[in-house]
């Protein structure tokens, strides 16, 4: 059965519901989505190389998906993000929180992404194993390195990862991650 997505305006006000295929065809319909920035104590963020119908083989943050409408209920961002981490990396019990959102439109052929995208963050220091059904691979990278790579090669990242990383940089958590990475580098040079 096809997933039902939650249609919203640019301020995340619910306007209705539509099948996933309708939301991603032509100009699509603006719907709820999220991208997850998973970080560790070293100040690194988890990146995955996507294996999806849209924007495949590009770098993404740790996970991205949509809150769903099912059995008359709307899945919350937190519930959807927890589902995503379980499905994509087998991770459970991570404390995840929304720190911001942005709107974007990204066409690809006759399909598109047209999303109000929440940036969700969580800390994780354990081992990671990507689900080979949804990712070609993954890597940890500092936020500074990721932002530099986005500037050098923007086409190698999905649009929502580029926008999410830039939003993270402006947030107090992003500033802390940048500082943590700098402190670790300075300590290793002593």
PLM regions and their residue ranges:
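Nudix hydrolase/Nudix homology domain
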Residues: 55-59, 63-64, 69, 100-103, ...
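Sequence-level motif detector for i,i+2 pairs with an aromatic at +2
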Residues: 2-3, 10-13, 42-43, 56, ...
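Conserved Nudix-box catalytic region and its N-terminal flanking loop in Nudix hydrolases
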Residues: 22-34, 44-83
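Acidic, metal-coordinating catalytic segment for phosphate/diphosphate chemistry
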Residues: 1-35, 39-42, 50
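Active-site segment of metal-dependent pyrophosphate-handling enzymes
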Residues: 42, 50, 77, 86-127
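Surface-exposed, flexible loop/turn segments at secondary-structure boundaries
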Residues: 13, 44, 53, 104, ...
């Amino acid at each position: 059965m096809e997933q039902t997505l939650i249609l919203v305006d640019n301020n995340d006000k619910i306007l209705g519901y539509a099948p996933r295929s309708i939301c991603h065809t032509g100009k699509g319909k603006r719907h709820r989505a999220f991208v997850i920035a998973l970080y560790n104590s070293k100040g690194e963020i988890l990146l995955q190389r996507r294996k999806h119908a849209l924007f495949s083989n590009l770098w993404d943050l740790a996970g991205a998906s949509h809150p769903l409408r099912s059995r008359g209920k709307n899945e919350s961002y937190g519930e959807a993000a927890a589902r995503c981490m379980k499905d994509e990396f087998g991770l459970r019990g991570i404390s995840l929180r929304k720190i911001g959102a942005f709107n974007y439109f990204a066409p690809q052929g006759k399909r598109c992404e047209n999303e109000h995208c929440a940036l969700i963050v969580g800390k994780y220091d354990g081992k990671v194993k990507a689900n080979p059904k949804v990712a070609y691979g993954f890597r940890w990278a500092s936020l500074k390195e990721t932002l530099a790579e986005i500037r050098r090669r923007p086409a190698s990242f999905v649009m929502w990862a580029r926008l999410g990383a830039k939003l993270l940089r402006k947030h107090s958590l992003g500033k802390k991650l940048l500082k943590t990475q700098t402190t670790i580098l300075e300590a290793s040079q002593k």
